[in-house]
Amino acid sequence: MADPGPDPESESESVFPREVGLFADSYSEKSQFCFCGHVLTITQNFGSRLGVAARVWDAALSLCNYFESQNVDFRGKKVIELGAGTGIVGILAALQGGDVTITDLPLALEQIQGNVQANVPAGGQAQVRALSWGIDHHVFPANYDLVLGADIVYLEPTFPLLLGTLQHLCRPHGTIYLASKMRKEHGTESFFQHLLPQHFQLELAQRDEDENVNIYRARHREPRPA
């Protein structure tokens, strides 16, 4: 009998460990947020099962605020959100006219799907799919106009996996928006200052001093002329 190989979900859990003690008590909480004229009702399912995927983090709110203040145009754009957690960023992109795929590890999909159903009208362009960076990203097309991520840069072993996933998903003239709490102890600054600029044209789009959140915009480097 042939060896079936490693189980993708088990492999992803070894790279993205659950922080069991983070939300030890299990409970759900609904919160409302207003962006771009939309009132979003987001359920956060706190508990050890979801860990960091349970809550709406500051970086996600900063990114939504940025999209509103900069009037970022999602209409007709093919969009994917990575490490979505609650799905708030991707949901806003869908409500703004994007054709959106919202992704995270399998354990977070039920929460995301519930939030999509609560906020995106029937017929809206928002689908929810599992994506484990560096493991199954190649089953997704390589033609996304916009790749979004909020507070997904905090585990150094995942940095090469995230980088490869970004390189695959973003089309040649597409744009990546990454919002991140700048945690020195998690290697976040190193990722944005050293690793990502090796492969993408990177610029700091906005800095939120109060929340210590940076929003970066990245694009593929133009090929050098022969």
From Swiss-Prot:
Transmembrane segments: none annotated. The keyword Methyltransferase applies. It catalyses: L-lysyl-[protein] + 3 S-adenosyl-L-methionine = N(6),N(6),N(6)-trimethyl-L-lysyl-[protein] + 3 S-adenosyl-L-homocysteine + 3 H(+); L-lysyl-[protein] + S-adenosyl-L-methionine = N(6)-methyl-L-lysyl-[protein] + S-adenosyl-L-homocysteine + H(+); N(6)-methyl-L-lysyl-[protein] + S-adenosyl-L-methionine = N(6),N(6)-dimethyl-L-lysyl-[protein] + S-adenosyl-L-homocysteine + H(+); N(6),N(6)-dimethyl-L-lysyl-[protein] + S-adenosyl-L-methionine = N(6),N(6),N(6)-trimethyl-L-lysyl-[protein] + S-adenosyl-L-homocysteine + H(+). Interacts with members of the heat shock protein 70 and 90 families and of the TCP-1 chaperonin family, as well as with HSPD1, STIP1 and tubulin; at least some of these proteins may be methylation substrates. This is EEF1A lysine methyltransferase 3. Keywords: Cytoplasm, Cytoskeleton, Methyltransferase, S-adenosyl-L-methionine, Transferase. One of its GO terms (molecular function) is methyltransferase activity. Belongs to the methyltransferase superfamily. METTL21 family. GO terms for cellular component: centrosome; chromosome; cytoplasm; cytosol; nucleoplasm; protein-containing complex. The keyword S-adenosyl-L-methionine applies. Its EC number is 2.1.1.-. PANTHER family: EEF1A LYSINE METHYLTRANSFERASE 3 (PTHR14614:SF5), HEPATOCELLULAR CARCINOMA-ASSOCIATED ANTIGEN (PTHR14614). SUPFAM superfamilies: S-adenosyl-L-methionine-dependent methyltransferases (SSF53335). Pfam families: Methyltransf_16. S-adenosyl-L-methionine binds at W57, G83, A84, G85, D104, W133, A150. GO terms for biological process: peptidyl-lysine methylation. Protein-lysine methyltransferase that selectively mono-, di- and trimethylates 'Lys-165' of the translation elongation factors EEF1A1 and EEF1A2 in an aminoacyl-tRNA and GTP-dependent manner. EEF1A1 methylation by EEF1AKMT3 is dynamic as well as inducible by stress conditions, such as ER-stress, and plays a regulatory role on mRNA translation. It is found in: Cytoplasm; Cytoplasm, Cytoskeleton, Microtubule organizing center, Centrosome. Its main location: cytoplasm. InterPro entries: Methyltransf_16, SAM-dependent_MTases_sf.
